[in-house]
Every structure is written in C-alpha cells, then in structure tokens.
A protein has these predicted regions:
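Active-site-adjacent substrate/metal-binding segments within catalytic domains
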Residues: 1-15, 55
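A structural motif corresponding to the C-terminal end of an alpha-helix
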Residues: 2-6, 66, 98, 189-197, ...
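Glycine-rich, histidine-containing beta strand-loop boundary motifs that form or position
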Residues: 9-13, 77, 106-108, 201
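Aromatic/acidic polysaccharide-binding cleft in carbohydrate-active enzymes
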Residues: 14-18, 157-267, 274-276
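Surface-exposed, active-site-proximal loop segments in enzymatic domains
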Residues: 15-31
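Active-site neighborhood of glycoside hydrolase catalytic domains
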Residues: 42, 46-57, 61-192
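C-terminal beta-sandwich/jelly-roll accessory domains of carbohydrate-active enzymes
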Residues: 254-262, 284-361
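Short, well-ordered beta-strand segments enriched in hydrophobic/aromatic residues
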Residues: 277-285
Length: 361
C-alpha cells in the first residue's frame, strides 16, 4: 500500500514442487483438496470481506479495517501436467461461485515453450482462467528473437501474465548491461501487445550479496548498501513511461521487432493522455549507431509539434559492464533535450542503446 502496489497472492493447489518431487505420493489426493480450496476462499474473505465476516473481522482486529481490494489470485506456481489440471478445476469452480469478480491466474508451467507449455495453454483456455502465468529465464539469443512473441497470440483467449523473466546472458546469471538491453528490446513487444499481456513482473526483486538463493535479481544489497542493476533501470524506464494508450509504430510497414530488414532495431509507442505526450521507446541492439527518423503521422492539420522534446538514453560502451556495490552508478540513464521539427525527430541511436523519447502534443 505504501508503494501504491496491489496484491497478487499465489496459493498452493495441492501439488508439491514438481521439480523437487514428482511422485504422486507427494501430492494431495483430489478428494482431500477441500481444505486447500477453503484456504483460498478464506484468503479472499480476509483481503476483501466486510468486517462482519469471520476473516474480515480478523483483518480489522489486526489493525486494517479497510479491505485490501484483492483483484487477482493465482492457483499454483510452475505446475504442469494433468495432475495440475484436475486440481485447478475445483479451485476455479469454487472461486467463480463465491467470488466471480476475482481474476484467476493459471500457469503454463516452468518453460516458455515445449511439451508442457503446449499442453497447458489449451487447457487454460478450456477452463477459462483469466490470465496465464508465463515464465522465461533465457539466454540473449532467445530475447533477441522474441520481440514478436505475442504478436500472434489469440486476442480472445486468456490474457498473459509474464510473471517471471530475465535474460541470463552468456552463462552469467547477473544483470550485466547487454542482458538489460535485450530485456528492453523484448519489452517493446510486451508493450505493443498490451491487449494480450496484461501484466509483467521481472525475476526476484531483492537479494543479499552473501545470502542469495536465485539470480538475476533487480536490487542487490549488503548490510550497509544497495545497488540498482541495469535491469532495474530498464524496468523503471518502462514503468515510469507506460502511457495510457498503445499506438502503432512501424518500420518498412512492419512492427519494429528486430526483423530481418530492421538492423536490430526494436520499438514501441504509447500516448500518455494524463501528461498529453507521446512516448516512443527505441532499442538498438546492433553494434553500430543508426540514424532514425520518428515521424508522427495521422495528426490533425492544426497540430504542429515543434520545439524541444526529451530523450532518456541508457547506454554502456562495455556490454559486460554492470552496477555493483563498489560502483553503484556506473551505468545510469541520462536525460537531455532533443529537437522536434515538423512533427518529426531526426536523430541517431547509438550502438547497443535504449532510448525513451517524450514529445508533448
């Protein structure tokens, strides 16, 4: 609440972690799921229920009489196979009956493709979950080739929740600049397909340098200091410049998603109705600087955009460089003005650079 965040709890569906133990004996039998389902229902009542309800009263007694306005509930994390489906269905049935306003999140398993992924997506559609949680921890080449991943997703199916993702990069599992750059490139496709991808969250947020369980992570810390990684800045540049409406942006009459004739360029564009400005994100993943022209077309004849816009440039000469506790600000975005003339921006995007352009209407 202090951060303006909203809750999205993930509840146990009666399956053990299938990575750790895929034996049927480790799972809750179907006819013994009732207590797990009731836990999920009680959680919703605790979060949203009136203080006259059993769990709403508990919440009030704990010092929070106002509801938490829970909107989403995920059932299971990185589960797969028929054993997941037969447990998910009774959860969905019970929640739909008692709390039809809650959006239910299912999962497509631990991978971004493959047998389990291909099995689970049709099942998620059949069961009619609201969102499907996709996870992908992948190397650089995967992110470079996945800028158009969501272009052909079914617009009528469940929405996507990209619930965990990160670019590992060259066998490393920390946040060097090139990994962050390719995450920025991938996110242009996420933003362009906002009608399909409802939410996205990066890999774990916080990790202690001497006590971590998983990497990469967005923020590293020791007992005295903390450091924001390159990936953190990418997330910040997207989160603080997300706009209110997606607008089309093309190169050679195609989406700018690193296609064969686009020289490693990726781009997305939004209109921010709150601040009355256009926001264009451009990522140059190539090894060479590239001249570009951003032309704002289809505007009313009375609209003339001339003057100064803003550009926020995120770049490192060394793709393997990173921010660390000793040099926490080695790589940070830099803001400056850029000329807008005749509804156009003519500029050059540096090699391996992520730029956010902001132009007021």
């Amino acid at each position: 609440e202090d951060m303006g965040a909203e809750p999205l709890p993930v509840v146990n569906c009666g399956l053990a972690c299938q990575y750790q133990n895929d034996s049927p004996e480790a799972n809750v039998p179907i006819d013994q799921l009732d207590s797990y389902i009731q836990d999920a229902l009680d959680l919703i009542e605790f979060a949203n229920g009136d203080i006259s309800t059993t769990w709403g009263k508990v919440r009030a007694e704990m010092g929070h009489p106002e509801p938490f306005h829970l909107k989403f509930l995920a059932i299971g994390n990185e589960q797969w196979g028929e054993e997941y489906i037969v447990r998910l269905e009774p959860f969905v049935k019970a929640i739909r009956k008692q709390y039809p306003e809650i959006k239910i999140v299912g999962t497509s398993g631990p991978g971004s493709e493959g047998e389990e992924f291909e099995y689970l997506w049709p099942e998620m559609k059949r069961i009619k979950v609201d969102l499907v949680d996709e996870h992908f921890y992948r190397p650089e080449n995967w992110f470079l080739k996945s800028g158009n991943r969501y272009d052909l997703y079914d617009r009528k199916g469940p929405k996507v929740f990209a619930g965990e993702y990160a670019c590992h990069g060259r066998g490393k599992k920390w946040n060097h600049f090139e990994a962050a750059l390719l995450e920025a490139a991938f996110l242009t496709g996420v933003e362009r397909n906002a009608d399909v991808v409802e939410m996205a969250t990066y890999a774990p947020l916080l990790a202690h340098v001497e006590g971590w369980q998983w990497r990469p992570d967005l923020i590293w810390f020791d007992n005295l200091k903390s450091v924001r990684t390159c990936s953190w800045y990418v997330q910040s540049l997207y989160g603080n410049n997300k706009g209110t409406n997606v607008i089309p942006i093309t190169l050679n009459k195609k989406a700018v998603s690193g296609q064969a004739d686009q020289n490693g360029l990726f781009a997305s564009a939004v209109w921010d109705g709150t601040n009355n400005e256009y926001i264009v994100k451009v990522v140059n993943t190539s090894q060479e600087a590239q001249p570009i022209q951003i032309a704002f077309e289809g505007l009313k004849k009375s609209v003339k955009m001339d003057g100064d816009g803003k550009q926020i440039i995120f770049h490192s000469d060394n793709p393997d460089a990173e921010n660390n506790l000793e040099q926490p600000f080695a790589i940070v975005p830099k803001e400056s003005t850029i000329e807008v003339k005749g509804n156009q921006i003519n500029t050059t995007v540096g090699a391996q650079t992520f730029v956010v352009y902001k132009v007021r209407k």
